[in-house]
Amino acid sequence: MEVPRLSQHMSTPNSPCEEMIKNLSLENIQLCERDGNKSQDSGIAEMEELPVPHNIKISNITCDSFKISWDMDPKSKDRITHYFVDLNKKENKNSNKFKHKDVPTKLVAKAVPLPMTVRGHWFLSPRTEYTVAVQTASKQVDGDYAVSEWSEIIEFCTADYSKVHLTQLMEKAEAIAGRMLKFSVFYRNQHKEYFDYIREHHGNVMQPSPKDNSGSHGSPISAKLEGIFFSCNTEFNTGKPQQDSPYGRYRVEIPAEKLFNPNTNLYFGDFYCMYTAYHYVILVIAPMGSPGDEFCKQRLPQLSLSDNKFLTCTQEHDGLVFHQAQDVILEVIYTDPVDLSWGNVAEIIGHQLMSLSTADAKKDPSCKTCNISVGR
């Protein structure tokens, strides 16, 4: 996309950018305000009518790109030199929460054959609703533009991270995972009332529920994958489960082989931090052929059970042996129901550290360790 030089007396926010809008998110870009469907740019001429884009189509949507095409009257097509694309986050329409109110959202592109690809992680975020409208423009000899009326406004939503993006994220997580330590149980902390409710109303069986929105905004498992959250990190000096927890003073401990064995598949789900030095890796364990397994197979990178940097299960002469990464906090999601009778419920002797909870935690978008160069 080329951003042409415009007349100095043009007003914003409806003026096109003078250079590619790099390193800016839509939160820091001024929304275009239009009265009806006409351009209000004082430096843009409307000497001759140009075709108005209509029947706009959005296709090939990814987490940080999309293709756009439209129909228009072919009579003046030869005079069109540029397209103006007005792109806004739907949630920020009519918002005034901007630091840089003089920066337009309008993207300017040379008139290329349609469909045209719009790509850029500096203004597109994954799983986010946007509105888009288009003008056709003709560059004049004095550097100003003749423009069409605005098209209708179209809404669309960007996609989640693909497996390719998640693999990039996984490789960054592997770089800091550290050495592997033995462990023997998965554990889940909750309040006493939770376990009482499971016994009384669910026949002693914990049921999967939708994952919250913690972690990367583009993670395909957030609010979609159903599972049960477990931990497995151990105290460095004892090899036993950590004494403290942010989630409750009661804990169920399940022998590792009950949840993680050769009849399960293991997937990488996410890598994030919460403005702290701690980094979290989300892994998914799914019984082979289960609905959770089918969900993950389509969306997440699959890991070898015995050879990965985060969580392993290996067969030795004494049986299955389990290891977990020392330098990241593992959040393990098991996708099937779990009977409390598989393990033991008891009160912990440590503290309930609420400040360490990751419930609906937002990822630090500025962290160089756990972000990749696509929408955050």
Curated annotation (Swiss-Prot):
InterPro entries: FN3_dom, FN3_sf, Ig-like_fold, PHYHIP/PHYHIPL, PHYIP/PHIPL_C. SMART domains: FN3 (SM00060). Pfam families: fn3, PHYHIP_C. It comes from the Eukaryota. One of its GO terms (cellular component) is cytoplasm. PROSITE patterns: FN3. Residues 52-161 form the Fibronectin type-III domain. Belongs to the PHYHIP family. May play a role in the development of the central system. This is Phytanoyl-CoA hydroxylase-interacting protein-like. The gene is phyhipl.
